[in-house]
């Protein structure tokens, strides 16, 4: 089994009694409670999502390969790069939203989708103990609709129409692939031993999120470097204060404090 790092980021500013009781990692009271909320129903949803998603990926990939033409190569390369960039931004937007707003107590989305983000900040190594289904189930669910739409086009459009759409569909497919594997890439960024050589090379070349790069996010209060697909956009977004400005705007409009629920779980001691 691949090894993982064992660091929590900087300690939160708790009073002395709380700090003495609080333990980071799997033994943290909040981490144990959040892990216990992972239900059989959630597991079933993940299994169904993964099976459907990868079936559609295989179907669509075969059709894209059959339609491939050399003259489309420049546009396909451009689409691959654009897909990776947009997937990185979307990963940051979702990550920032789930980290910063909402609550585990929210109906439906709380336990199903926000819970893993709260657990991850308390126990960053938990993701390395998740199997392929738990790691990728939610992302597979999100990409089902665009995959179904693409499959529908391949089944209903004429070959001539598909040739015209080919560069666009390659862009969409690349965006879907990066989106589907974002949490797997995220898991690899927390795994420090036993990764396949090809994964570490992609990390070293910064094709996917590097391990050291992602550690910046895991410094409490987890308010920066949210993009977790390639990580390409983290520095420029931080440089212009994108997330901070967005948080200030939302707080000004709603009065809600960023990361209030995240901090509540981090401070839980029993």
From Swiss-Prot:
Q: Which reaction does it catalyse?
A: a 1-(1,2-saturated alkyl)-2-acyl-sn-glycero-3-phosphoethanolamine + 2 Fe(II)-[cytochrome b5] + O2 + 2 H(+) = a 1-O-(1Z-alkenyl)-2-acyl-sn-glycero-3-phosphoethanolamine + 2 Fe(III)-[cytochrome b5] + 2 H2O; a 1-O-hexadecyl-2-acyl-sn-glycero-3-phosphoethanolamine + 2 Fe(II)-[cytochrome b5] + O2 + 2 H(+) = a 1-O-(1Z-hexadecenyl)-2-acyl-sn-glycero-3-phosphoethanolamine + 2 Fe(III)-[cytochrome b5] + 2 H2O; a 1-O-octadecyl-2-acyl-sn-glycero-3-phosphoethanolamine + 2 Fe(II)-[cytochrome b5] + O2 + 2 H(+) = a 1-O-(1Z-octadecenyl)-2-acyl-sn-glycero-3-phosphoethanolamine + 2 Fe(III)-[cytochrome b5] + 2 H2O; a 1-O-(9Z-octadecenyl)-2-acyl-sn-glycero-3-phosphoethanolamine + 2 Fe(II)-[cytochrome b5] + O2 + 2 H(+) = a 1-O-(1Z,9Z-octadecadienyl)-2-acyl-sn-glycero-3-phosphoethanolamine + 2 Fe(III)-[cytochrome b5] + 2 H2O
Q: What class of enzyme is it?
A: oxidoreductase
Q: What is the effect of changing residue 217 to A?
A: Loss of plasmanylethanolamine desaturase activity
Q: What is the effect of changing residue 218 to A?
A: Loss of plasmanylethanolamine desaturase activity
Where in the cell does this protein reside? Endoplasmic reticulum membrane
Phenotypic consequence of residue 190 to A: Loss of plasmanylethanolamine desaturase activity
Q: Where is this site: Essential for catalytic activity?
A: 95, 120-121, 186, 190, 214, 217-218
Intervals of motif Histidine box-1: 186-190
The organism sits in which domain of life?
Eukaryota
Q: Name one GO molecular function term.
A: plasmanylethanolamine desaturase activity
Effect noted on mutating residue 206 to A? No effect on plasmanylethanolamine desaturase activity
Transmembrane segments annotated in the record for this chain = 47-67, 74-94, 161-181
GO BP terms, alphabetized:
ether lipid biosynthetic process; fatty acid metabolic process
- Lipid bilayer topology: Multi-pass membrane protein
Q: What is its EC number?
A: 1.14.19.77
Chief localization class? endoplasmic reticulum
Q: In which pathway does it act?
A: Lipid metabolism; fatty acid metabolism
Keyword terms of this UniProt record? Endoplasmic reticulum, Fatty acid metabolism, Lipid metabolism, Membrane, Oxidoreductase, Transmembrane, Transmembrane helix
Annotated Gene Ontology cellular component terms: endoplasmic reticulum; endoplasmic reticulum membrane
Motif Histidine box-2: where in chain: 213-217
Family indicated by similarity: Belongs to the fatty acid desaturase CarF family.
Q: What is known of its domains?
A: Histidine box-1 and -2 together with other histidine residues are essential for catalytic activity.
More about this protein? In human, PEDS1 and UBE2V1 are adjacent genes which can produce independent proteins and can also be fused to form a PEDS1-UBE2V1 hybrid protein.
Q: What does this protein do?
A: Plasmanylethanolamine desaturase involved in plasmalogen biogenesis in the endoplasmic reticulum membrane. Plasmalogens are glycerophospholipids with a hydrocarbon chain linked by a vinyl ether bond at the glycerol sn-1 position, and are involved in antioxidative and signaling mechanisms.
Q: What is this protein called?
A: Plasmanylethanolamine desaturase 1
The organism encoding this protein is: Homo sapiens (Human)
From the broadest rank down, the organism's phylogenetic lineage runs: Eukaryota, Metazoa, Chordata, Craniata, Vertebrata
């Amino acid at each position: 089994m691949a090894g993982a790092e064992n660091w929590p980021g900087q300690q939160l500013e708790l009073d002395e009694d709380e700090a003495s009781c609080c333990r980071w990692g799997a033994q943290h009271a909040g981490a144990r409670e959040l892990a216990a909320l992972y239900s059989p129903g959630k597991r079933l949803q993940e299994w169904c999502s993964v099976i459907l998603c990868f079936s559609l990926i295989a179907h669509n990939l075969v059709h894209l390969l059959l339609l491939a033409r050399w003259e489309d190569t420049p546009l396909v390369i451009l689409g691959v790069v654009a897909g990776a960039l947009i997937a990185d931004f979307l990963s940051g937007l979702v990550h920032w939203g789930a980290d910063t707003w909402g609550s585990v107590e929210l109906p439906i989305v709380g336990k199903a989708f926000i819970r893993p983000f709260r657990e991850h900040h308390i126990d960053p190594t938990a993701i390395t103990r998740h199997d392929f289904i738990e790691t990728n189930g939610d992302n597979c669910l999100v990409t089902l609709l665009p995959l179904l739409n693409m499959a529908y086009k391949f089944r209903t459009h004429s070959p001539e129409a598909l040739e015209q759409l080919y560069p666009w569909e390659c862009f969409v497919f690349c965006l879907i692939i990066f989106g589907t594997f974002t949490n797997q890439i995220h898991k690899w960024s927390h795994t420090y031993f036993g990764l396949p050589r090809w994964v570490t090379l992609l990390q070293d070349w910064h094709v996917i999120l590097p391990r050291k790069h992602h550690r910046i996010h895991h410094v409490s209060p987890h308010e920066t470097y949210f993009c977790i697909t390639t990580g390409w956009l983290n520095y420029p977004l931080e440089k212009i204060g994108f997330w901070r400005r967005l948080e200030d705007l939302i707080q000004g409009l709603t009065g809600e404090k960023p990361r209030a629920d995240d901090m509540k779980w981090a401070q839980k001691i029993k």
